[in-house]
């Protein structure tokens, strides 16, 4: 089973909110997941981005072999910079 850390879109039209999830790579993006690591809310109006991410859980899943997507790598870097 290939495990990935990816973003699953939530929220309303023109107001995206993303859930950072750990899931099997063969499942749909919004389908069943193994764990929720946090949320990411990019602000379309230019305000600060809101990132709530459990970095300890992220490191734990990466050590177990989960592969983060490119966008999730960017979100992790933003969360570590805070």
Curated annotation (Swiss-Prot):
SUPFAM superfamilies cross-referenced by the UniProt entry: Ribosomal protein S16
Keyword set, alphabetical order: Ribonucleoprotein, Ribosomal protein
InterPro entries according to UniProt: Ribosomal_bS16 (IPR000307), Ribosomal_bS16_CS (IPR020592), Ribosomal_bS16_dom_sf (IPR023803)
GO cellular component: cytoplasm; small ribosomal subunit
Coiled coil: none
GO molecular function: structural constituent of ribosome
GO BP of this protein: translation
Similarity comment text for this entry: Belongs to the bacterial ribosomal protein bS16 family.
Stated name of the protein: Small ribosomal subunit protein bS16
Annotated source species: Bdellovibrio bacteriovorus (strain ATCC 15356 / DSM 50701 / NCIMB 9529 / HD100)
């Amino acid at each position: 089973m290939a495990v990935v850390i990816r973003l699953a879109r939530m929220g309303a039209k023109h107001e995206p909110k993303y859930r950072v999830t750990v899931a099997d790579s063969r499942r749909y993006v919004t389908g069943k997941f193994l764990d929720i690591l946090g949320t990411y809310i990019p602000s379309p109006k230019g305000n600060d981005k809101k990132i709530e991410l459990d970095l300890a859980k992220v490191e734990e899943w990466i050590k177990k072999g989960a592969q983060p997507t490119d966008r999730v790598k960017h979100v992790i870097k933003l969360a570590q910079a805070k």
